[in-house]
């Protein structure tokens, strides 16, 4: 075992099973299962160990979980558990990092479709607001998802920390769908002595780092590339950057030279999000992944390191971080990427003047060859991008890189909410939940329709509820309902629903109706040499592409390319319901269609 990169599973402490009883007053009663071990320590070496104590079995009888405020007078109506965490460090100077989470074994759909079934993990014991570490609700979560409690908690000496886990149904809950439900949660965790920070984003001359201020509306501000507020992947805050007009309300040079100034949205041409280089732990080499959704174990990696695992439990560098610059199929020196920039939204604008913007219709009805050409335009001088950088249509492996990161502890780590904006497919829109769980009458309670989408979607990219079936914002805002890969405004949008997105993934150089006269250079597309998912990449599994490894996760469509339909598209469309999602994959002949859009990526010289 590589002692410098070992990860040690440390906890399997407390299983709490809740059984629904139902009733006019009591929504739930709960009871323990058989006796559980509640304090387990795993020690791999003599250097350190970690343990946690969940407080013993639940044996105190029933608690009636009813809609409630949480205070000293309502203790019979909510769950509160003390959790003691004890790292033991036996080597002077050793630093370790602990993660703690709740594994969801089962969760009723009524509990997954409300904002009011809530949790909080705190350092204080007086209330769920007393020293919050993490808090939220279970909206959009299903079995095999995790609820984050601690992430990379740093310890430099032996100690015992006490935290408090709160679970309750908020007093604002009025929906009867939360009755007659059940859930099963397991406290779990891991510990490591290695923490690798993500590679710093590599900026092209035209890319300007930004942050989002959502305290009063949505204000986009420039930020220094060395400012710690730019990104924090451990807190699911991904790095964003923009391309701007050379001369708009302000000049490009002004924005580049002045960190902290507000950017006029009319000056923005494109938004990008940085996906830092990483390796991930292989969890399967077969095709039977359906129903086996899990947190993807990701470790950030420097360009000096290439991981080449091929067996379950080993690590492999994600293939999107090799840019085969000379298209010779050989991994040459200088071709390892520190990361890639991915379009934050589906490509917008026109074929001759593309943009990447929110709240506008995506660019559709192009053949793959035309999409490929349009994506390259975003790398031109009009956008301020240097000729040494490479703007291109997103490859299938690059789609995989973004989705794998989203389903790790650094992303939303659940199914991404759907963009349910119909027909014109406005970018960045959200149904406020996962596909299949967005009926109109649940969001707009004065409506009776159970249709899962409308013309404009329900929420904007920055969380504003739209007035029903209009393109105008209401004053109501729900930042936790955005449809991004992080669950917040810093992530990538439109990867579930919206338009179907062609990607540069092709069966055996089969052009079909794509419009190409010959295939582009090999660095621009992923070539699948067979129609078997187990042998399509150099005779083996296509690691990292979001194919066999994530086959039919969350019930997403799972078709492979063929001689008749040789081009992949991803994500599903706005009206696919539960079949849409970031792991959705389908095939087509490369022709144009009003539902088919695409996404642009950018490889920066020096990355």
Residue map of PLM features:
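N-terminal module-boundary/linker segments of secreted carbohydrate-active enzymes
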Residues: 196-313, 328
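C-terminal, surface-exposed recognition/capping segments
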Residues: 397-400, 421-461, 471-472, 486-487, ...
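Extracellular adhesion/glycan-binding regions together with long Ser/Thr-
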Residues: 3-4, 64-73, 128-169
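Short aromatic-cysteine micro-motif
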Residues: 262, 266-269, 301-495, 604
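C-terminal, structured domain-capping segment
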Residues: 30, 77-101, 106-107, 145-195
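A solvent-exposed, charged loop/short amphipathic helix patch at secondary-structure junctions
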Residues: 347-371, 513-538
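Surface-exposed interaction patch
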Residues: 16-20, 29-32, 71-136
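Short, polar/proline-rich extracytoplasmic segments that appear immediately after membrane translocation
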Residues: 2-72, 177-196
């Amino acid at each position: 075992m590589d002692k410098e990169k070992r990860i040690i599973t440390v906890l399997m402490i407390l299983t709490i099973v809740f059984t629904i009883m139902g009733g006019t007053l009591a929504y739930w009663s709960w009871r323990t299962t058989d006796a559980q071990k509640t304090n387990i320590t795993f020690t791999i070496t003599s250097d350190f160990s970690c343990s946690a104590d969940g407080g013993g079995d639940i044996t105190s009888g029933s608690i009636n979980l009813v809609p409630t405020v949480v205070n000293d007078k309502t203790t019979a109506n909510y769950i509160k558990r003390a959790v003691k965490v004890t790292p033991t460090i036996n080597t002077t100077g050793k630093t370790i990092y602990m993660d703690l989470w709740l594994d969801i074994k089962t969760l009723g759909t009524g509990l997954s479709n409300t904002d009011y079934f809530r949790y909080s993990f705190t350092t204080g014991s007086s209330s769920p607001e007393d020293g919050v570490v993490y808090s939220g609700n279970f909206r959009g979560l299903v079995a095999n998802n995790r609820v984050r409690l601690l992430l990379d908690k740093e310890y430099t000496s032996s100690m015992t920390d006490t935290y408090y886990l709160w679970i309750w149904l908020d007093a604002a809950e009025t929906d009867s769908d939360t009755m007659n439900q059940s859930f099963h949660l397991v406290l779990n965790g891991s510990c490591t002595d290695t923490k690798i920070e993500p590679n710093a984003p590599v900026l092209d001359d035209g890319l300007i780092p930004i942050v989002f201020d959502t305290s009063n509306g949505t204000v986009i501000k420039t930020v220094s590339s060395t400012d710690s507020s730019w990104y924090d992947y451990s807190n699911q805050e991904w790095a964003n950057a923009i391309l701007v007009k050379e001369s708009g309300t302000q000049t490009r040079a002004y924005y580049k030279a002045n960190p902290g100034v507000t950017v006029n949205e009319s000056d923005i041409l494109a938004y990008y999000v940085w996906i830092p280089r990483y390796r991930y732990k292989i969890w399967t080499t077969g095709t039977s992944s359906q129903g086996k959704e899990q947190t993807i174990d990701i470790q950030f990696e420097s360009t000096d390191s290439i991981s080449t695992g091929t067996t379950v439990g080993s690590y492999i560098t994600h293939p999107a971080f090799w840019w085969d610059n000379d298209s010779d199929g050989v991994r040459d020196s200088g071709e390892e990427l520190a990361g890639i920039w991915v379009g934050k939204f589906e490509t917008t604008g026109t074929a001759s003047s593309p943009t990447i913007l929110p709240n506008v219709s995506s660019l559709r009805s192009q053949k793959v060859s035309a999409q490929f050409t349009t994506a390259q335009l975003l790398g031109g001088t009009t956008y301020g991008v240097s000729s040494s950088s490479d703007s291109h249509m997103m490859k299938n492996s690059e789609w995989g890189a973004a989705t794998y990161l989203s389903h790790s502890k650094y992303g939303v780590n659940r199914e991404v909410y759907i963009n349910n904006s119909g027909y014109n497919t406005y970018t960045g829109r959200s149904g406020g939940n996962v596909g299949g769980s967005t009926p109109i009458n649940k969001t707009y309670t004065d409506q009776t329709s159970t249709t899962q989408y409308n013309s404009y979607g329900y929420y904007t990219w920055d969380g504003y509820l739209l007035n029903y079936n209009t393109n105008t914002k209401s004053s109501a805002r729900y930042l936790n309902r955005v449809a991004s890969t992080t669950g917040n405004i810093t992530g990538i949008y439109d990867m579930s629903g919206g338009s179907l997105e062609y990607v540069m993934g092709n069966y055996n150089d089969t052009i079909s109706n794509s419009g190409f006269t010959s295939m582009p250079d090999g660095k621009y597309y992923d070539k699948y040499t067979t129609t078997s998912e187990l042998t399509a990449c150099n005779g083996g599994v296509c690691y990292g592409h979001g194919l066999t490894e994530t086959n039919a996760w969350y019930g997403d469509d799972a078709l492979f390319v063929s001689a008749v339909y040789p081009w992949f598209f991803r994500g599903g469309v706005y009206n696919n319901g539960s079949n849409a999602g970031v792991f959705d994959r389908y095939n087509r002949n490369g022709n144009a269609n009003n539902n088919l859009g695409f996404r642009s990526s950018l490889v920066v010289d020096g990355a």
